[in-house]
């Protein structure tokens, strides 16, 4: 009886609650919202850059996926940030993140032995460049039934290619004295059909760069890139890159046409870069350092992204500014102000170190709009862009608050 009473009372209350209504009076329009208030916000999260907007088709191209988070140390399956006071709570942080070194090393890569005898390992030896210290070493005792041992990259959920399109290939190889063969680069469909290939001769023992334009004979969103070695011996592979020839506005190291055009069609007044929490970083050393995103992408060290993967920084500061110019949007640059993400380690720099951060902001402004008579404006001009970029806004920090921020 008590239950029946409460149910009846509840139903009565439900009936008595007035239903909300929304009235729109078209005769009294409010103030017009300026177009300058509508923009878009880029952040390297959920592979929105690497694997989407940025046109690179090869994942883990420099074999650096396993490199520890800057400012952290590895111990027993975790990377640990240094204990330091959190800039909001003042309590010592104990931030850590799980880290499977061996799994991360081989992200997107595998070795097809084809019934041969071979092994592979990510190593730190015979460095190609300080920014890409690791490479893939392949030790071949005997080639298999196909006559090759194949290093395969599966891209970001596949290497998508279209019939008749061209793709810019770039990779580096060095060999041991024993290795007398060559290397064949292939784009292979998900049902093992060769869609494009090019054979190269490895002529010296030091690092050798190989480039080619591959034209595909078929369409497959799940294709792979394969580097096929045809003799016994040891070879090292580093920085493997495959780009569609047709990028947005045909920019080198550019953006996917389809994704970039969707953003352009929004007609944003501004673009915010490089993002939100990644600006701060999990630690202060893990923050985005815009100067490390310039130049040849092979020389960009990249960084672990606190959204749990390593980013190439291929869509760097220059590419961001160029994209803004290409779609007639103003640029909003978000800069670190000496604070890491409050919800990760939350460490911060001493006030005496702030001049370094202030100078970094000034240098970023100079790179974008300097007249070329100053250091960073001159670097922009050397990079092939003589006119200033449309940088209009500089945002100091991301979602920061509290006494130390102010």
Model-derived features: where do they sit?
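A structural motif corresponding to the C-terminal end of an alpha-helix
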Residues: 319-330, 387
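Bacterial Sec-dependent N-terminal signal peptides
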Residues: 1-20
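Active-site neighborhood of glycoside hydrolase catalytic domains
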Residues: 356-363, 367-378, 382-406
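A structural signal for well-ordered alpha-helical segments within the folded catalytic domains
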Residues: 315-318, 322, 358-362
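Short linear capping/connector segments at secondary-structure termini
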Residues: 338-339, 346, 380-382
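Extracellular and organelle-lumenal recognition/adhesion modules and their flexible linkers in secreted
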Residues: 19-312, 330, 345-355, 362
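Solvent-exposed loop/turn segments at secondary-structure junctions
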Residues: 46-47, 276-280, 337-341, 398-403
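Hydrophobic beta-strand scaffold residues
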Residues: 331-335
């Amino acid at each position: 009886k008590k239950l029946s009473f409460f149910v009846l009372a509840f139903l009565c209350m439900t009936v008595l609650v007035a239903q909300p209504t929304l009235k729109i009076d078209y005769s009294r329009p409010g103030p017009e919202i300026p177009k300058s208030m509508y923009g878009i916000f880029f952040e390297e999260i959920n592979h929105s850059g690497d694997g989407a907007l940025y046109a690179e088709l090869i994942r883990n191209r420099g074999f650096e996926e396993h490199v520890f988070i800057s400012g952290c140390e590895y111990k027993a399956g975790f990377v640990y940030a240094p204990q330091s006071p959190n800039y909001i709570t003042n309590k010592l942080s104990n931030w850590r993140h799980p880290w499977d070194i061996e799994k991360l090393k081989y992200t997107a890569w595998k070795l097809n032995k084809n019934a041969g005898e071979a092994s592979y390992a990510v190593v730190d030896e015979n460095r190609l460049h300080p920014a890409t210290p690791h490479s893939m070493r392949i030790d071949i005792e005997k080639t298999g039934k196909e006559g090759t041992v194949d290093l395969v990259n599966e891209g970001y959920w596949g290497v998508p290619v279209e019939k008749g399109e061209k793709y810019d290939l770039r990779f580096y190889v060095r060999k041991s004295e024993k290795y007398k063969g060559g290397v064949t680069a292939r784009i292979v469909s998900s049902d093992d059909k060769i869609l494009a290939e090019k054979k190269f001769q490895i002529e010296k023992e030091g690092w050798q760069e190989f480039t080619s334009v591959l034209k595909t004979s078929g369409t497959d969103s799940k294709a792979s890139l394969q580097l096929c070695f045809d003799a016994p011996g040891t070879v090292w592979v580093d920085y493997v890159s495959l780009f569609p020839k047709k990028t947005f506005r045909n920019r080198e190291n550019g953006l996917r046409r389809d994704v970039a055009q969707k953003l352009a069609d929004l007609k944003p007044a501004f673009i915010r870069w490089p993002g939100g929490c990644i600006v701060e970083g999990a630690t202060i050393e893990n923050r985005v350092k815009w100067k490390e995103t310039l130049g040849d992408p092979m020389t960009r060290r990249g960084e672990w992204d606190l959204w749990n993967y390593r980013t190439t920084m291929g869509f760097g500061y220059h590419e961001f500014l160029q994209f803004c110019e290409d779609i007639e949007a103003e640029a909003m640059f978000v800069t670190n102000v000496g604070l890491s993400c409050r919800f990760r380690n939350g460490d911060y720099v001493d006030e005496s170190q702030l001049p370094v951060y202030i100078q970094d902001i000034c240098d970023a402004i100079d790179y974008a709009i300097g007249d070329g008579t100053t250091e960073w404006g001159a670097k922009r001009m050397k990079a092939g862009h003589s006119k200033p970029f449309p940088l209009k806004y500089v945002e100091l920090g991301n979602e920061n608050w509290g006494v130390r921020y102010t």
